[in-house]
Amino acid sequence: LSLIEFMTVEPTDDPELFIGRSEPYGQFGIYGGHYLGQALAAALQTVPEPMLAQSFHGYFLAGGVPGKDLQYRVTSLRDAKRGATRTITAFQGDTQVFFMMAAFKQPEAGDQHQKVGPDVAQARAADNLHAARQLPFMFPIELHDRVEIEWASKTFFEGSPGDPHPLRLWMRVRGGELLDERERQIVMAFLADGPLALNSIIHHGVPMDTHRGASIDQAAWFHR
């Protein structure tokens, strides 16, 4: 299955309940982005088009059992002409494993601003340096050959004091060029708990061979 096919959740006779697959992610249990992507996919099924996700905040409550189906219950907190708010709770059996609150709105033009991005090696150049930057492990999102990652950072295990962008990389989902805007948001939610989250610790030079990180919560805003 492609990533977007795997993130798809199936409706049930209950309009607020959706069923999603799960699978092992190595020693990490169920990867946090798996919850994020499927929860957003469930909520989007309850929101009329052309609304898109504006933001979400998710809380990881339990590791979950890989290979066991997930049930996502969506609750409507607000439905307005130009926006909507949903909560999404994921269960395995009677165990609550994940919770999300998400906001949605109609696409519209508005004021825009953007910080100047850092200089990053183009994907092809990063690919040429792949062997020199080979990591001694794979990230969960790489395990099922749905996501390609190329590192553009000079180093991975050492922080760069004063550098606000210590981790630079390219990520590509196989078949991503065929996705619509909602599907791209689901994919971005899936990727959000991946390597990019490590920017919070790499800046401090925390050695990954002696420290273990775990996601407690995750917030994201979708900008146009």
Predicted features along the sequence, with ranges:
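Terminal targeting signals and extreme-terminal segments of soluble enzymes
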Residues: 1-224
